[in-house]
């Protein structure tokens, strides 16, 4: 079930991106300012995107509560694959063959990584020392990367801020898992008497704000692969650091899983770089005219 919930979360995220972006560029009057905002909030497609986003959060929470962080977060990479399918079937974009091959390789290597690494274990009650050390280290790393990303060329800024954003999203996943545990243990009322729900609210808000800044400072072809690749790497590190999750002790299996993970990262980068740069539908094919005899 955790794997199914994680895939549903990835699909819902892809649905959110495609629907809201399609709605935002589909205004026939090209309104600006408050008129554009009014157009969006009255657009059923844009509102449906928010429903999809809420569904993504619920599915991710269910996956993290019932499964391992080191399994759930890497599976969210499939958002790019789902988005590609939606763009082809719904928006009717023409997708290059290399992009489809990259998507297929992403799925295969992801499955190979999870099956060969054999993630297991996990401590449902991490120690205070683990929480403080992990959160302080990741928060400090986010701050350093964000400060370095304030200046420089657009590509450099997009890469640095993208890395900072992805680390924050990994931290958000950790807090989601902790919050669901307190919810089940203490109920809705008791959840608000414990810190994870507030840590989630603050980190989630900061992650979204930093994500918006990242999207505006540099090319998406740089920031998107960084965010998608760094998030599962940091999540796996935090799964071991905080929740004491373990992996196979067999050297061969670990070697294969590491190679599969590296190949997955490469395929994700290729997918992001070769996918259509916009959500605009591909123009219809025009058959060449037959010259008169």
Residues covered by each model-derived region:
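Polytopic alpha-helical membrane proteins, predominantly small-molecule transporters/carriers
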Residues: 1-293
